[in-house]
Amino acid sequence: MTTLHRSAVAALLVGFAATALSAQSTFEQVDPMIGTGGEGHTFPGAVAPFGMVQFSPDTDTGCILRACYGHAAGYRYDDPTIQGFSLTHFSGAGHSDLGDFLMMPIAGNDVPLEPGDAGKPGSGYRSRYDHAAETARPGYYSVVLQDHGVRAELTAGTRVGMARYRAASSTQPMHLILDLRSSLYNYPGKILWSSIRLRPDGTVTGCRQTRGWAPDRTLCFALRFSVPLRGHAFVSTETDVAYKGFQGPGRGSDAVAERAGRALVARFDFGAVDRPIEVRSAISSVDEAGAIANLASEPGDFDAIRAKTMAAWRAALDVLKIEAPAPMQTSVATALYHALLAPAVAGDVDGRYRGPDNQVHHAQGYTFRSTFSLWDTFRAEHPLLTIVQPPSTSSDIVRSLVASRQHSPDGILPVWQFQGRETWTMIGYHAAPVIADAYLKGIRGFDADAALAAMVASATYAPYGGLGDYMKRGYVPIDREPEAASKTVEYAYDDWTIARMARAMGRTDIAARFGQRAGNWRNSFDARTGFIRARKTDGTFRVPFDPTAINYGSDYTEGNAWQYGWFVPQDQAALVRALGGDAATIAKLDAMFEFDNSKLDYSHAEDIAGLIGQYIHGNEPSHHVAYLYSYAGAPWRTQARLKQIVESQYHPTPDGLSGNDDLGQMSAWLVFTALGFYPVTPASLEYVIGRPFVNRAMLALPNGRRLTIIADRLDDGHPYVGTVMLNGRPVTRAYLRHDEIMAGGELRFTMQSMPNTAWAAGRADRPYSASMVRTPAKPVKRELAKRLG
């Protein structure tokens, strides 16, 4: 067959596949309830793609710290009551904050100002509800509040939240509670100060300063109502106030135009109305003027905002069309939805935002984003965005990261940041792989020199996480810094990504320096035990050593030696050699998955979930491990393990995620894996081939091309890959290059009942490792980047 003929046939096949999938809307398959139970920590409420406002119900805000873990997203599926609806939430985080500006509608004459007890109906403004009267769709949420006789509907634009409240009886007076005392992880003393004012035009504005996960966080709000106010009260419930000053007009009255304090709750009275009440809301981390501007940035009533946001979700989600059994279709569609919630817009419509220095800055020519859970999301979430979103999304992310470094009091890139404020959560300088991966894929629109300088600054900031010792010794010593084993290997990977970007930019001096540091993982590898271990300042490994032990602040970060023993993504081939070769590596991988945990107790470790032996899918350090068989010449074993993981860890139910979704990382893992490939090493420009879990998929790439993925004979009886074809040509290696994905066409898997042990088993067929002779995939040049989008 001639090349021209082969290309024409491939194009025709792609056209047929696209036609077959065109009727399948991914938007219609999404179920935002997935992950709202169990350990998923997702929320069901209304949000636009990457929206600043996440308008969602909170079922319990009174719990504190560790007791609050299950309510990190505000909502928990098995809770019997809803306390109210607040404007800010994390999706899938393992810690929490937010839950700002909680509102609750009430119909009737009794208007309590306290939330009450969930176990005592009628004791406060919280209300019982029934899941049968609850609806969650992308950009829309509704529920009937049984105790108040009110149907509440929520929708949201990028910077606007819209609520519509309808009383069961038009003769009942309607009220709205706004509780500025409420927050997620709402321990005593969290609310430092709050204010509220009723402006002459009827707009309600205010600000709140909190001390929570992010210290000294300021957030302002603005509200407008679709019906006139009949009355209001701004109440302070603060006790033991040492000095009250002088009362203003209406001494002692709560019907004042403004109030400030540490414990404020507001009541708005509308009287009996014969139509639904719509409440428009917006937030700003800058000031009240910013919130008011955001309030006006998206005109229209509830239905108009809902229609606009649903259209945005259709466009964002329908870049991927899938054909699969219904449970898998729902799981993958919802995974893509969850992957498009963060990093969230954090700048006002005029470009202003609050940075890590707590000062106001201006984003010119881009949208400032925040909510960076980088320890989680560098792995698959950010690589996924490069193939399902326009390049401007990743460009905005990089510009936001670099701007944050420029405004950081410490002069480094974000670690775990939200609303521009740093939390210092987790380890590593994982903004580096995010930036390097984007740059090497040809994404531009940012200052590459400033980005590289920011990466180097973060990797050489001695006070951070033992970096001073790391630069001096080549490892982080455990007797000077906790979680030293994890930090050593994660720093080494981040160093490799800096070297990769520097080399692509012609900065050979930086490339050589950080390329050498990329080998520092060897300093924590114990050849005797075959594990990554923590060393002391005297060079000895810390004892006693138990590879199954998990304790916070110990040698490892949210894991143990079994999980961290595999974290050398920049040079897995070298790790295979260090472990004794292919057979020894395969045996050790099998031992990990088949480990007997019956005598172990991890109940004290809240992030340890989704165990398959010592493989822990509910937390990120294990996410690449199933793909490592391919580095030892056994891709068929990767295929078997992936089937085991997907079938046990993902279900289309509220408790369908085995662990925290972590701002889209758990979900991005499933999207990639379902399509048949995964970015084990971001910034390598390669994806390791696994096996598909969908019969067909059509991916509309950001450059205008389409990649159609077909899995022939895919069913439970055919779990193994027999052959792989890309645009009619056999793929006999265990990886795909990024440029091959972006070129589009047809990727066809033929599945079979028995393993094809010969496929991609040769050493030359293995994915990239730094110590390999094979040349890595070349970075996408600027000219090609323009053509590829």
Language-model-detected regions and their locations in the chain:
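Bacterial N-terminal signal peptides that target proteins for export
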Residues: M1-A10
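ATP-dependent phospho-/nucleotidyl transfer catalytic cores
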Residues: D494
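Bacterial N-terminal signal peptides
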Residues: A10-T19
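Accessory carbohydrate-recognition regions in carbohydrate-active enzymes
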Residues: Q24-P433, Y439-V489, T497, A502-N523, ...
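Extracellular attachment/recognition segments
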Residues: Y720
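Long, low-complexity, intrinsically disordered segments
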Residues: K781-G789
